Amino acid sequence: MSILKIQAREIFDSRGNPTIEVDLYTKKGLFRAAVPSGASTGIYEALELRDNDKTRFLGKGVSKAVEHVNKTIAPALVNKNVSVVEQEKIDKLMIEMDGSENKSKFGANAILGVSLAVCKAGAAEKDIPLYRHIADLAGNKEVILPVPAFNVINGGSHAGNKLAMQEFMILPIGAECFKEAMRIGAEVYHNLKNVIKEKYGKDATNVGDEGGFAPNILENKEALELLKTAISKAGYADKIVIGMDVAASEFYRDGKYDLDFKSPDDRSRYITPDQLADLYKGFVKNYPVVSIEDPFDQDDWPAWKKFTAESGIQVVGDDLTVTNPKRIAKAVQEKSCNCLLLKVNQIGSVTESLQACKLAQSNGWGVMVSHRSGETEDTFIADLVVGLCTGQIKTGAPCRSERLAKYNQLLRIEEELGSKARFAGRNFRNPRVN
């Protein structure tokens, strides 16, 4: 069925910054999608078009991207009479119209908004749930509920504390189903709140952009200790593992790393990639850390390769790979990591996101679907992770509605699947499909 009308507008993300929302109409009704936005962005990401008009939203408006949808993309798609089930055809058309390497003409945010709305409309056109439509587009017969990675302690560019490393996550891999994983996550979260309150005072339990706590600690090991204590207090030591997102590009300085980068600069405290790798190995040895994302800078290829070969854990590429098939192909060739972080707005279309996922999976990598720190109430990625069978998702702490929107949608999907629901559990790195 063809597209009758497309209307884009400026709305607000969870940080109070403008972002783009797209309404797409077919005879089946209205399909709405909103685009997220990141704080710690990789330099190789597709371009998020901002107005840079300092008199309006401090330069962060997206009225140009909105205009590109309303004045250029919308008329083209309506006139072309393409069917909303033809996801790849529509995405290709928009990418060709943009004509740039990184979607800088229209903005990845403009193209993605339309792409997401098309995908939702395509599912309705086929009278199937969105996750099933995504599974069809990806060629998957099965669907799998993911293990949630709850970001419960925030540091780095997501928090106003001294902590260098950006995210400390709990993964309830020992749960029997997604619903139980949510309960475990929530219970540990509340235990953690009490542990932090007792140790650092009530104001230390204020939450960061993704709903995690941001106590003013400097030592990354201290964050792991807090998690260990909360997990054991909740009684889930046998059911939970820990994941980290270091976001090391944020504190990479002239070939070295500054673990106190939020303090005045002092070169004498910089450490080498090898010293940083040793620190990680200590974490893995002393805590149940099974996954580390962005352990090194996005261009520090030798450090990535060495650590992935030596560590034996899941090493996740985010800034390194930016959901871009070309960067992923290079990382596969270099053996730089073994898991892709999939963020739809890094590449800017549903079709390319699916291609990135398939490329990673076909090379034996794991894939973790991810939100951004600036989120909306849109729940697309919940259906995406189920349809792509990646087995793992990170979309914040069990706190803040823009995070819970995704987790709650996953609860609904699990309920809808009933006895057919499969939960990735301990196989989260490679949930066997078919």
Curated annotation (Swiss-Prot):
<keyword id="KW-0324">Glycolysis</keyword>
<feature type="binding site">
    <location>
        <position position="394"/>
    </location>
    <ligand>
        <name>substrate</name>
    </ligand>
</feature>
<dbReference type="Pfam" id="PF03952">
    <property type="entry name" value="Enolase_N"/>
</dbReference>
<feature type="binding site">
    <location>
        <position position="40"/>
    </location>
    <ligand>
        <name>Mg(2+) 1</name>
    </ligand>
</feature>
<comment type="similarity">
    <text>Belongs to the enolase family.</text>
</comment>
<dbReference type="InterPro" id="IPR036849">
    <property type="entry name" value="Enolase-like_C_sf"/>
</dbReference>
<dbReference type="InterPro" id="IPR000941">
    <property type="entry name" value="Enolase"/>
</dbReference>
<dbReference type="InterPro" id="IPR020809">
    <property type="entry name" value="Enolase_CS"/>
</dbReference>
<feature type="binding site">
    <location>
        <position position="245"/>
    </location>
    <ligand>
        <name>Mg(2+) 2</name>
    </ligand>
</feature>
<dbReference type="GO" id="GO:0004634">
    <property type="term" value="F:phosphopyruvate hydratase activity"/>
</dbReference>
<dbReference type="InterPro" id="IPR020811">
    <property type="entry name" value="Enolase_N"/>
</dbReference>
<dbReference type="InterPro" id="IPR020810">
    <property type="entry name" value="Enolase_C"/>
</dbReference>
<feature type="binding site">
    <location>
        <position position="167"/>
    </location>
    <ligand>
        <name>substrate</name>
    </ligand>
</feature>
<feature type="binding site">
    <location>
        <position position="158"/>
    </location>
    <ligand>
        <name>substrate</name>
    </ligand>
</feature>
<protein>
    <recommendedName>
        <fullName>Alpha-enolase</fullName>
        <ecNumber>4.2.1.11</ecNumber>
    </recommendedName>
</protein>
<dbReference type="Pfam" id="PF00113">
    <property type="entry name" value="Enolase_C"/>
</dbReference>
<feature type="binding site">
    <location>
        <position position="318"/>
    </location>
    <ligand>
        <name>substrate</name>
    </ligand>
</feature>
<dbReference type="GO" id="GO:0000287">
    <property type="term" value="F:magnesium ion binding"/>
</dbReference>
<feature type="active site" description="Proton acceptor">
    <location>
        <position position="343"/>
    </location>
</feature>
<dbReference type="GO" id="GO:0000015">
    <property type="term" value="C:phosphopyruvate hydratase complex"/>
</dbReference>
<keyword id="KW-0460">Magnesium</keyword>
<keyword id="KW-0963">Cytoplasm</keyword>
<feature type="binding site">
    <location>
        <begin position="370"/>
        <end position="373"/>
    </location>
    <ligand>
        <name>substrate</name>
    </ligand>
</feature>
<feature type="active site" description="Proton donor">
    <location>
        <position position="210"/>
    </location>
</feature>
<keyword id="KW-0456">Lyase</keyword>
<comment type="pathway">
    <text>Carbohydrate degradation; glycolysis; pyruvate from D-glyceraldehyde 3-phosphate: step 4/5.</text>
</comment>
<keyword id="KW-0479">Metal-binding</keyword>
<feature type="binding site">
    <location>
        <position position="293"/>
    </location>
    <ligand>
        <name>substrate</name>
    </ligand>
</feature>
<dbReference type="GO" id="GO:0006096">
    <property type="term" value="P:glycolytic process"/>
</dbReference>
<feature type="binding site">
    <location>
        <position position="293"/>
    </location>
    <ligand>
        <name>Mg(2+) 2</name>
    </ligand>
</feature>
<dbReference type="InterPro" id="IPR029017">
    <property type="entry name" value="Enolase-like_N"/>
</dbReference>
<feature type="binding site">
    <location>
        <position position="318"/>
    </location>
    <ligand>
        <name>Mg(2+) 2</name>
    </ligand>
</feature>
<comment type="subunit">
    <text>Homodimer.</text>
</comment>
